[in-house]
């Protein structure tokens, strides 16, 4: 099984692709850049976009994981929805299954959340709604990592010191959540 991950530092922090590969026994490849939005993965004029388009055109994948910039589903929802739609088209042309990696609200009471200017519950709700809507409209699998973080936020520290990026436990929770969704689908299709 081959998995491609398109996104940013929420993927490469703590080497989440290696964690996902270990759990799924799949080959996992990432195409990431810190701060990247999904729109950039579609732009052949950027290094990241040219590579993403090449990977989708020239290599065979079973699953392609899409992860938007941390607050992008809220601050640029229209752009996010359009990017998911376009990427899902390219992913399906490849014969792969799109998976949305739904990310989390910034750390409760953390400096990143304070800078963003909304409360934790509101950010969680808006992120959850945006990813759920994108998954429904595009018929994708949804790895709801944001909800997994939300459920554990009172009992576990899942964040790096910046209040945005995951610590190792957070990346592991993300890998487990993504793996669970992919393995369930793969088993149903006889791939796992």
Question: What spans do the regions from the language model cover?
Answer:
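Conserved SGNH/GDSL esterase-like catalytic core that processes O-acyl groups on lipids
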Residues: 2-6, 10-85
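Short catalytic/ligand-binding loop motif for oxyanion handling, primarily in non-cytosolic enzymes
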Residues: 12-13, 73-74, 107-110, 151-152
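A generic structural signal for well-ordered alpha-helical segments
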Residues: 21-24, 91, 135
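Conserved beta-strand segments of alpha/beta enzyme cores
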Residues: 27-29, 97, 139-141
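Short, well-ordered secondary-structure micro-motifs
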Residues: 41, 111-112, 153-155
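Alpha-helical scaffolding segments of alpha/beta enzyme cores, especially the outer helices
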Residues: 79-93, 122, 126-133
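Active-site segments of SGNH/GDSL-like serine hydrolases
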Residues: 92-125, 145-147
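Catalytic His-Asp segment of secreted/periplasmic serine-dependent ester chemistry enzymes
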Residues: 116-192
